[in-house]
Amino acid sequence: MTRTDPPDLLVSTVYQDIKVATPGPASKCSPCERSVARPAEPAPFNKRHCRSFDFLEALDGPAMETLPEPPPPESAVPRARTREAEPRRRARSKSAPRAPPGLTPAPASPPVLPRRGREAQRAARAEASPRREPAYPALRALANELHPIKLQPQRGGPGRVAPLCAAAGRCAPPEPPAGPAPHVRCRLDIKPDDAVLQHATRGSRSCGPTEAAHWARPAPQFHGLTVPGPRHMALSRTPTPSDSYCADPRAFYCDGPLPGPRDYAERRSLPFTTPPGPTQFFYTEEPQGFRGSFAASPGPTFDAYYPRPYPSEELSGPSPRRMGGYYAGEVRTFPIQEPPSRSYYGEAPRAYGLPYGPRYVPEEPRAHSTARPFYTEDFGRYRERDVLARTYPHPRSSPAWADWGPRPYRTLQVVPPSDPDPLLASWHGGTGTSPPRLATDSRHYSRSWDNILAPGPRREDPLGRGRSYENLLGREVREPRGVSPEGRRPPVVVNLSTSPRRYAALSLSETSLTEKGRAGEGLGRNWYVTPEITITDNDLRATERPSARAWELPGGRTRPPPHAAPDGPTSGRQRSLEQLDELITDLVIDSRPTAGQASEPAADCLGPQLRRLLDSRPAGSGAPALAPPRSPPASAGSAEEPAAPGEAADASPEPSADEDDLMTCSNARCRRTETMFNACLYFKSCHSCYTYYCSRLCRREDWDAHKARCVYGRVGSVCRHVLQFCRDSGPVHRAFSRIARVGFLSRGRGVLFLGFPSPGSADNFLRFGLEGLLLSPTYLSLRELATHAAPLGSYARELAAAGRLYEPAECFLLSVSVAVGPGTAPPGTPALPAPAPRSHGPTVRKFAKVALAAGSPARPPPARSREPDMETLILTPPPGTAGLDQDGEAGRRAREVAFIHIQRELRLRGVFLRHEFPRVYEQLCEFVEANRRFTPTTIYPTDRRTGRPFMCMIMAASEPRALDWVASANLLDDIM
């Protein structure tokens, strides 16, 4: 906003260091009781003054020349005063608020002195000048008379200066003052009255000659040029504009001891003992002096500048005399002051002396104006405060706001506006029967919850008590966001610790909890949190599950869990599980689509999935603790649990299955039962269907019985046998090698395809060789393979990748395809339903690299016997290891070093004892733990680096092997 009328820079008090003479003739001032006259030119100010346009010419006008003595305190009724019209009309500022022609005077208005000289001869104007006094003089006593363009930021950095109190150095009152008394820091969490809460939405009222103002009446909605104040800041620890701006002008000070929120029941008879207020004030001088309209507020005037610090160790004292009242119907900026995150005094608050230290300017015994508070605030934050105010669904006069006890000050009954602003989505889902309980009680997880939800908290911004949504939404509004998805910040990710049941449920819809805003990028969008669950507990049982969940309320909102009383150490885990369930459900603020959006399918909404999952609690107390053992859904074709005809597609294990469910090994000779949690981690499945086994050994043992029912597994086994037969059979190997070699030389890299119309034809090939082939092998280059990529799908991509990597001079690619055909079981086996296959294609395909056959067909095959030059590795404890036979920790440590050395030597060659030689591994573990000796053991592993087997002798309990260089034949040459 720009000013249309240039300010008078020479007389403006913003330029404090320029000393100029006041324009116009200077008249004599009335002598004060101190009998010292004021100097001719004004003293420089060392504090910047924030003044509205109504206050620009107040200090340099003729009204400041002579000020009579203030009237007695009894004359609190405002005196009517008319203004003469100005001969010269000034240009009006576009940013100044336009006062309506009539305003209702406040009942507590200060006396106003008439103008003198030329000012008294001016004619009355239709509207007040924005640079002079308003039409109604009582408005000059407003504590928030400050234009938004002159707002000065008072917070936001470590260099913030505490506001100062500009004293009123006028003539002393007739009675001698009781002495300077230090201020008491007024820091009080209190709920403001209804008039304060509705102040931001009320406009200017018409001014009339009525003596009393009728407060309880609906106010029309005006839209002025002033910044709207916040309306929902009552529950925060931070003093809010509503706390600071109340109907009682003396409420900015605290005369007595500071009470807590629970002390109000005892202080109902003392309505003015501890009024609420901010912690710091900033005063500017006023061109007129008058006494306050409340005569019951004693206290001397001030005559010095001093900072108002935050620490509460200052002594109590009488409050200063506050002059003027408030007009609750005026739309103006609100006083806002927030405390810093830490004290300015550090560890020793009393080391800085008295709070009313030395004066910054030499004081003169001249008539000063009444001290008047002005509050400064960054007006860019008003928008976010207004948005936070619109997130609370209850009116300010409802019982939801009455959780701080009775109000210890006078209130004004103000009717709430008839058309409130639309409600925004917030983090307190409280439109149900009970109001949100964000700050009423504290739970043991709320502290970490605030830290989780506050993204990057700044040190100078104190967190509200239990109001994580306010900190989150406040920063969301504060940070501008682009329309493109790249410009948006990703949603908050919360890491929790829970059971696999909840982990699986939230994993079902990992993208459903994202930012789902309305059509625009305005402030009405809804933020959703993406939970990321980490599994840590796997021993949950049905008896430990919470018996009831109170997360379902009218409107689909969630509410915090009730506070569980500590009833013993045995129920600690039960309470933690209940709170964990409620905490997860609280993440979903409202999973329903907003108005105007198409409703999502029920399967895509996380809300119904969470409801179905978390409400699946066990039956009554008579039900068994564990669910009956059942086979996994994958083994739907087993004899113990036959599958229904339509369950083939749904036979995969449920990711949201309960952790108390059990899974049984499909091997009939094992039937091992494990919990669903352990089964998901350790169980192995068939490669062709969803049949699970507890280990690979059980899968191999059950293959003969399983392949009778698993059609795809049986056909896949045929493919593997064909590939092995092509390697082992000499005539087949030479024939296929010749075809592949000629195809590569003529058409480049490619694949040799061998197809069978049925598993029976493949069996004939295995029995009769080349004479049993029904289809001749075909060589396709990679370019030709690309033309058939559509029907092959991912298998074609795998073939192309392997075709670019193989070495044509040494091997070729052989692909075997077998059509599944009718799923007939082998003869002699009972007809059982087939388990659910992993793929439903009509053909099973497998490929492998096959080495090219030798050029001479008469060349004998190489002998398969073990070579005499096989490498031998002898493993003993490392050199320097001693004390293997000792008992205690020293001996155990020595044996552990020997064990680590043996494993390291084998792992360098790609051998893992635990998997390949588990018996030897168990012997070594017993040797380390219990010093149980065993005889030297010989194993024949394969070196993964060379592919050749070697002999390894493990002698863990023998003496350490001598150093290799000591046994060297050229030891002397190496030393010399």
UniProtKB/Swiss-Prot annotation:
Coarse class of the protein's main subcellular location: membrane
Compositionally biased tracts (Pro residues): 98-113
Start and end residues of each stretch annotated as Disordered: 21-49, 61-136, 220-242, 264-294, 412-443, 539-574, 614-660, 855-888
Keywords recorded for this protein, A-Z: Cell junction, Cell membrane, Cell projection, Membrane, Methylation, Phosphoprotein
Annotated Low complexity bias: 616-625, 633-655
Entry-annotated residues carrying Omega-N-methylarginine: 322, 749
Modified residue annotations for Asymmetric dimethylarginine: 749
Magnesium found in the keyword field: no
Biased composition, class Basic and acidic residues, residue ranges: 116-134
Location of Phosphoserine modifications: 52, 129, 468, 509, 512
Name used for this protein in its record: Apical junction component 1 homolog
Primary gene name: AJM1
